[in-house]
């Protein structure tokens, strides 16, 4: 179980590296050789997408202001980047614990999981759904995850000016907040990802 009153962090490189095992799960669904793994890293440049920010992201501020009261106990920042959002929550009284590069134990469960700007850098829809499934598997029975993706189609057509890969993502999940620049989706632990029609009408 996730420790009460703590915010855990997991950096994007740990989430996305095909050779990393998150618990007992291999995100890619297959093993890649070191050469293939390096090619994937070079092709997508996902390790360069974590921005250096002096302020927390807009989704982090919105989540704290609107649903933060649900997030205090057993929270994981899944793909925390440089940790700016985690520090933002820590200043506001959350006990931040866990190294940025620590993989999850297969039995770790969290009341809430935050995943911001991670899914846009995964080229494969199949692998994006594997990441979402992995997040779902680490929720407590009453847990929720909030998945933030960029929604500016003009700048999500593959390559950015900084040489990183970003793709437009439309998830089969309920939307809790949508604005210019990003969308926040909600994933509940009971959702059957193979049958979105069962939960899209219930939320």
Q: Model-derived features: where do they sit?
A:
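Short catalytic micro-motifs in class I SAM-dependent methyltransferases
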Residues: 117-118
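A short glycine-rich, Lys/Arg-flanked "PGG" loop and its adjoining helix->strand segment in the class I
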Residues: 129-141
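Intrinsic, low-complexity polybasic segments
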Residues: 4-6
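Class I (Rossmann-like) S-adenosyl-L-methionine-dependent methyltransferase catalytic domain
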Residues: 8-106, 144-203
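Acyl-donor binding region in acyl/amide transferases
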Residues: 121, 127-130
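A conserved beta-strand element that flanks and buttresses the S-adenosyl-L-methionine
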Residues: 114
């Amino acid at each position: 179980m996730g420790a009460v009153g703590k915010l855990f962090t997991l950096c994007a490189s740990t989430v996305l590296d095909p050779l990393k095992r998150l618990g007992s799960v291999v995100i890619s669904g297959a093993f890649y050789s070191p050469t293939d793994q390096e090619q994937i890293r070079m092709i997508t440049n996902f390790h360069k997408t974590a921005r250096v920010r002096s302020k927390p992201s807009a989704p982090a501020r919105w989540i704290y202001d609107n649903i933060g009261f649900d997030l205090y106990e057993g929270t994981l920042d899944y793909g925390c980047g440089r940790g700016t959002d985690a520090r933002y929550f820590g200043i506001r009284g959350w006990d931040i614990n866990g190294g940025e590069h620590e993989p999850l134990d297969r039995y770790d469960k969290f009341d809430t999981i935050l995943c911001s700007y991670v899914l846009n850098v995964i080229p494969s829809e199949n692998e994006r759904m594997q990441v979402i499934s992995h997040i779902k598997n680490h929720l407590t029975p009453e847990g929720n995850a909030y998945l933030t993706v960029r929604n500016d189609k003009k700048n999500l057509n593959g390559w950015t000016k900084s040489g990183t890969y970003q793709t437009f993502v439309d998830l089969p999940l309920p939307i809790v907040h949508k604005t210019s620049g990003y969308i926040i989706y909600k994933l509940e632990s009971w959702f059957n990802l193979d049958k979105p029609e069962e939960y899209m009408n219930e939320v």
